[in-house]
Amino acid sequence: MSKHFFLHNEFHWQGRHDAEDGAAGSRVHHVVQQIDYTHIGENPYGVALLGFACDAGVARNKGRIGAKKSPDLIRRALANLAWHSPHPLYDLGTVVCDDDLLESSQQHCAKIIAEVLPCVPVITLGGGHEVAWASFSGLARYFEQHHPEKAPKIGIINFDAHFDLRAFSSSQADVKPSSGTPFNQIQHYCQQQGWDFHYACLGVSKASNTRALFERAEQLNVWFVEDKDLGSVNHDYHLTQLQHFIDDCDYLYLTIDLDVFPAATAPGVSAPAARGVSYDNLAPFLDRILAHRDKLMLADIAEYNPTYDVDSQTARLAARLCWDIANAMNDKLEHQ
């Protein structure tokens, strides 16, 4: 148990061991190090993993709960993947949100991210997509503490079937922060700080977002591409648009909601997609983002819900995405 009451670090990393291969047979479970986040400065190279076990945001958004169980199951799927980098992974544990204590849990998560980012990049494992507000809050704290002299140009790239731009405050009692509000919260924060709001949402479903949400996205100048338009026919055009978006930003925050994938690929989510975007169609966009690893500071994977998974296939998808991102972040370290 971590000495921090809100942070659990009890996962036991284990997996296949091929003794005959020696060091060349390394897998994630061989190289991951479980450490206290306050000691991260003693470990200057690598990538940090942080869990965010939370159902509160999805429950508030009237969704199917179960994502609270996901961080350790993603870790389990990640453990056996081969590891080729000379740099390790650091497991900082999991921030656990009990009951409806969403806001305090998000602040705990943000605090850890802000303290770790000066040393290593971070991948957060949700939890519902309320993790995005926690992640961005940590990134914002980092800039406020270490680079207060200049407003950062942060590009937020969200692979998601939903805009997650719902209202988070209202005179109506049931309107409050949830898994459906994080990017509206981020926009509000940026407006208060005088920061530009650079938000891209790729894979959005017209069937799953009301006209009010599309109007909100247009009002905020969100660059979005619908799920039906992310096919291979349109790759070159949209990849060019993505490159322009990246070029206009100094830093990148990548967030992946697993419900962007078809239900057949990712059944284990709160809101499975009838259409979605195939991994093959999404991969060129992810690869383009990861090619700009020098700008990528932070990423998270959200909305895995093991209650509805089939043969752990969504867990394996989440683990592979985490693996891809972590390898790109470690490649950045090798080229510094």
Swiss-Prot record:
For this UniProt record, give its keywords in alphabetical order, as a comma-separated list: Histidine metabolism, Hydrolase, Manganese, Metal-binding
Q: SUPFAM superfamilies of this UniProt entry?
A: Arginase/deacetylase
Q: Which cofactor does it need?
A: Mn(2+)
Q: Where does Mn(2+) 2 bind?
A: 160, 162, 257, 259
Q: Which residues bind Mn(2+) 1?
A: 129, 160, 164, 257
Q: Which reaction equation describes what this protein catalyses?
A: N-formimidoyl-L-glutamate + H2O = formamide + L-glutamate
Q: What is its EC number?
A: 3.5.3.8
What's the record's note on cofactor binding? Binds 2 manganese ions per subunit.
Tagged with keyword Metal-binding: yes
UniProt keyword Metal-binding present:
yes
Molecular function as annotated in GO: agmatinase activity; formimidoylglutamase activity; manganese ion binding
Q: Record's CDD domains?
A: Formimidoylglutamase
Q: Which Pfam families match?
A: Arginase
What GO biological process terms are annotated to this protein in UniProt?
L-histidine catabolic process to glutamate and formamide; L-histidine catabolic process to glutamate and formate; putrescine biosynthetic process from arginine, via agmatine
Q: Copy the pathway line from the protein's UniProt record.
A: Amino-acid degradation; L-histidine degradation into L-glutamate; L-glutamate from N-formimidoyl-L-glutamate (hydrolase route): step 1/1
Q: What HAMAP family does UniProt report for this protein, alphabetically? A: Formimidoylglutam
- Family statement: Belongs to the arginase family.
Q: What does this protein do?
A: Catalyzes the conversion of N-formimidoyl-L-glutamate to L-glutamate and formamide.
This protein is called what?
Formimidoylglutamase
Q: What organism, scientifically named, is this protein from? A: Vibrio vulnificus (strain YJ016)
Gene expressing this chain? hutG
